[in-house]
Amino acid sequence: MRAPMTLKGVRRLRDELEHLKSVKRPEIINAIAEARAHGDLKENAEYHAAREQQSFIEGRIKQLEGELSHAEVIDVAKLNAGTKIVFGATVTLVDLETDEESRYQIVGDLEADIKQGLVAISSPVARALIGKQEGDTIVIEAPAGRREYEVVAVEYIS
């Protein structure tokens, strides 16, 4: 099944994959060779640590390759949805109780990072936003309780 992902998200994953393959993988191969040179592998902590790290890196490479092979890349800058909220939209919300403003971009599940304001398309926040437009009010059921927000801006920025 194809997973929607922004162009920016795909670039980030490709950069990580390239770094793992061209920098981390050779480093770990050298570390294993160096640890082997120290002799007995049964009690060689450096060797076992390097092999464990190699296993982690190879697993992450496989994971990234799989994610990228299933990505449906969407160039947000080319979307023409106007003020309607769809995948890729950057949305500015105002909490109707506190007047606090927040800004989120709706992205694919694999690229979500709430600290960077990237919310997954499958998240409760994104589900409440999809299909709405500037001026609409949304209600989000959060662990801290029910919150009401007004959509004050919708942008499509790559």
Swiss-Prot record:
GO molecular function: DNA binding; RNA polymerase binding
Coiled coil: 45-72
Stretches that traverse the bilayer: none
Entry keyword set: Coiled coil, DNA-binding, Transcription, Transcription regulation
Gene3D superfamilies: Transcription elongation factor, GreA/GreB, C-terminal domain, Transcription elongation factor, GreA/GreB, N-terminal domain
Domain of life of the source: Bacteria
GO terms under biological process: DNA-templated transcription elongation; regulation of DNA-templated transcription elongation
InterPro entries: GreA/GreB_C_sf, TF_GreA/GreB_CS, Tscrpt_elong_fac_GreA, Tscrpt_elong_fac_GreA/B, Tscrpt_elong_fac_GreA/B_C, Tscrpt_elong_fac_GreA/B_fam, Tscrpt_elong_fac_GreA/B_N, Tscrpt_elong_fac_GreA/B_N_sf
PANTHER family: TRANSCRIPTION ELONGATION FACTOR GREA
Family: Belongs to the GreA/GreB family.
Function: Necessary for efficient RNA polymerase transcription elongation past template-encoded arresting sites. The arresting sites in DNA have the property of trapping a certain fraction of elongating RNA polymerases that pass through, resulting in locked ternary complexes. Cleavage of the nascent transcript by cleavage factors such as GreA or GreB allows the resumption of elongation from the new 3'terminus. GreA releases sequences of 2 to 3 nucleotides.
NCBIfam families in the cross-refs: greA (TIGR01462), PRK00226.1-2 (NF001261), PRK00226.1-4 (NF001263), PRK00226.1-5 (NF001264)
Protein name stated in the entry: Transcription elongation factor GreA
Species per Swiss-Prot/TrEMBL record: Xylella fastidiosa (strain 9a5c)
Organism ancestry: Bacteria, Pseudomonadati, Pseudomonadota, Gammaproteobacteria, Lysobacterales
